[in-house]
From Swiss-Prot:
Binding positions for Zn(2+) per the UniProt entry: C326, C329, C394, C397
Coiled-coil ranges per UniProt: none
Function as written in the Swiss-Prot or TrEMBL entry: Substrate recognition component of a DCX (DDB1-CUL4-X-box) E3 protein ligase complex that mediates the ubiquitination and subsequent proteasomal degradation of target proteins, such as MEIS2. Normal degradation of key regulatory proteins is required for normal limb outgrowth and expression of the fibroblast growth factor FGF8. Maintains presynaptic glutamate release and consequently cognitive functions, such as memory and learning, by negatively regulating large-conductance calcium-activated potassium (BK) channels in excitatory neurons.
Name listed for the protein in its UniProt record: Protein cereblon
GO cellular component, one term: nucleus
Length: 447
């Protein structure tokens, strides 16, 4: 990712400008500003008047992009030959939007050919930057396209969306240099409700689920009350088995979705339930795309073949994760889960691309710690219109962590926030008690 490759070219860590050299006085001012951010008023803004639809539109790519309609879906378990974009180092989740800015002649030629066919390419999932072979991936379908010619250089800007998971069978390189993968499309296994075989006609009237589901914005207490009533009615047949009803609820999609939503509201109190997918499969993928976890955990979520197990793993991650630390120095805490909030319709984290073609999955948080700022604020190619960005680095190891965004207008809320790149973060769980700490204890989450 860009945080590793940025050491070779400092210009690729920003959103468009070359890294600006500033005086030591400016650096001291930035340090003072950061200290103020840690000790200032800790209250988060109650009202966000920023248009959250702007980041999802990716307007920085241009407004006159050619849009395509329809979608391409391959049959489950079918084998397909799909071209691969080799330099896209993003672990794409189905349903996740992927913006691209391609300038290599081979990639430009490949995208042109895709536009004439099914507009589908493969994004391989690498668990780390040193892995040479990928075993899983996701198909991506282009839904918006723009071609540019400037100074004799041809570039294409693309908006794509993840569609289906696949397992890589083999890869080969064609005579024109384009890599093609032979993949098997992985199906989504829909598990039946365990109560289906226990439903008796005489009890059918008791199986009507409560319809007064709490709307978005209601208190957690009302949601818990609804969930309790839902479980009591849906798992009425559990009395005929040797297993308690709460055990069936652990594998019920609707119950898991409500529990995940409660966790999401702890991460983002402004989240609206009606903005989330109602389908368990789509919902599980939306949550997976928003979790600030490393690639090792994300690829495990990508391998799971049913929504229920995926939701259970996501719930485990969210309940254990309390803070995020620097990936290169894990003892350095960067932010906590209470600081996460959504400034986009996609949720607290989404993928964005800079003019150099590097894709950053950026997590928005109110406050961050142990960071130093480099350069001066700039609004050029800002992913959040109305905000100026400043490069942020880890104060301990100096690795690129993301950006600080400051509002250019006083009437814009929030006035400032941080955008942290997922590739530089590592989730961490609290240290256990001294008596429970074993020799192999690690604060890093694992499934």
């Amino acid at each position: 990712m860009a945080d590793d490759e940025g050491e070779e070219d400092p210009g690729i860590n920003n959103m468009g400008n070359l890294l600006q050299v500033i005086s030591s006085e400016s650096e001291e001012e930035d340090e003072m500003e950061l200290e103020d951010a840690k000790t200032a008023d800790s209250e988060s803004p109650n009202i966000i008047n920023f248009d959250t639809s702007l980041p999802t539109s990716h307007a920085y790519l241009g407004v006159d992009m050619e849009e395509f309609h329809g979608r391409t879906l391959h049959d489950d378990d079918s084998c397909q030959q799909i071209p691969v974009l080799p330099h896209v180092q993003v672990m794409l989740i189905p349903g996740q939007t992927l913006p691209l800015h391609l300038s290599r002649p081979q990639e430009v030629s490949m995208v042109r050919g895709l536009i004439q066919r099914d507009r589908t390419f493969a994004v391989l999932a690498y668990s780390d930057g040193l892995q040479r072979e990928a075993h899983f991936g996701t198909t991506a379908e282009i839904y918006a396209y723009r071609e540019e010619h400037e100074f004799g250089i041809e570039t294409v800007k693309v908006k794509a969306i993840g569609r289906q998971r696949f397992q890589v069978l083999e890869t080969r390189t064609q005579a024109d240099g384009i890599q093609v993968a032979r993949v098997q499309i992985l199906p989504e296994r829909v598990l039946p409700c365990p109560m289906t075989s226990l439903q008796l006609d005489s009890q059918s009237r008791h199986l009507l689920f409560p319809t007064n589901k709490p709307v978005s914005g209601r208190s957690p207490q009302s949601k818990c009350q609804w969930l309790h009533k839902y479980r009591r009615r849906k798992f009425l047949g559990a009395s005929l088995t040797s297993w308690p009803s709460w055990l069936y609820a652990l594998y019920d999609a609707d119950s898991l979705m409500e529990r995940v939503k409660l966790q999401l509201h702890e991460w983002d109190e402004n989240l609206r339930d009606d903005s989330l997918p109602a389908n368990p499969i789509d919902f599980s993928y939306r949550v997976a795309a928003c979790l600030p976890i490393d690639d090792a955990l994300r690829i495990q979520l990508l391998q799971i073949g049913n929504a229920i197990q995926r939701l259970r793993c996501e719930l485990d991650i969210m309940s254990k994760c309390t803070s995020l630390c620097c990936k290169h120095c894990p003892d350095t805490e960067i932010t906590t889960k209470n600081e996460i909030f959504s400034l986009s319709l996609c949720g607290p984290m989404a993928a964005y691309v800079n003019p150099h073609g590097y894709v950053h999955e950026t997590l928005t948080v109110y406050k961050a710690f142990n960071l130093s700022l480099v350069g001066r604020p700039s609004t050029e190619n800002s992913w959040f219109p109305g905000f100026a960005w400043t490069i942020a680095q880890c104060r301990v190891c100096g690795s690129h962590m993301g950006w600080k965004f400051t509002a250019v207008r006083k009437d814009l809320s929030p006035q400032k926030f941080w955008g942290l790149t997922r590739s530089a973060l590592q989730p961490r769980i609290p240290e256990p008690d001294e008596g429970e700490m074993g020799h192999d204890h690690s604060p890093i989450l694992c499934l």
